[in-house]
């Protein structure tokens, strides 16, 4: 057991250095995209989002959604699924658990 601990203690600095070297460029890429994609909407973008929602509601009322191409329908479905999943992730974080609330 002592030999294992000694070997681990000898190899740990090189393993940590390798992990840092490996993760630095990937972390920089992650932060770049996180700053771009996870930023909340600006006040100037809110009217555009409202118009988009109104357009979706209008297309549901008139039935114009039936004229979407398959590609547009798939993309709309993926966006809706992403929003739905982020809602559930927020619920899990808020509940501090996957099932049930602590009441």
UniProtKB/Swiss-Prot annotation:
Subcellular location, record wording: Mitochondrion; Mitochondrion inner membrane
GO cellular component terms given for this protein: mitochondrial inner membrane; mitochondrion; proton-transporting ATP synthase complex
GO molecular function term, any single one: P-type proton-exporting transporter activity
Family annotation (InterPro entries): ATP_synth_F0_gsu_mt, ATP_synth_su_G_mt_met
Keywords per UniProt: Acetylation, ATP synthesis, CF(0), Hydrogen ion transport, Ion transport, Membrane, Mitochondrion, Mitochondrion inner membrane, Transport
GO terms under biological process: proton motive force-driven ATP synthesis
Chief place where the protein resides: mitochondrion
Positions of modified residues (N-acetylalanine): 2
Modified residues (N6-acetyllysine): 11, 24, 35, 54
A Pfam family that the UniProt record links to this protein: ATP-synt_G
Cited function: Subunit g, of the mitochondrial membrane ATP synthase complex (F(1)F(0) ATP synthase or Complex V) that produces ATP from ADP in the presence of a proton gradient across the membrane which is generated by electron transport complexes of the respiratory chain. ATP synthase complex consist of a soluble F(1) head domain - the catalytic core - and a membrane F(1) domain - the membrane proton channel. These two domains are linked by a central stalk rotating inside the F(1) region and a stationary peripheral stalk.
Quaternary data: Component of the ATP synthase complex composed at least of ATP5F1A/subunit alpha, ATP5F1B/subunit beta, ATP5MC1/subunit c (homooctomer), MT-ATP6/subunit a, MT-ATP8/subunit 8, ATP5ME/subunit e, ATP5MF/subunit f, ATP5MG/subunit g, ATP5MK/subunit k, ATP5MJ/subunit j, ATP5F1C/subunit gamma, ATP5F1D/subunit delta, ATP5F1E/subunit epsilon, ATP5PF/subunit F6, ATP5PB/subunit b, ATP5PD/subunit d, ATP5PO/subunit OSCP.
Family as reported in the entry's similarity comment: Belongs to the ATPase g subunit family.
Protein's name in the database: ATP synthase F(0) complex subunit g, mitochondrial
Organism: Mus musculus
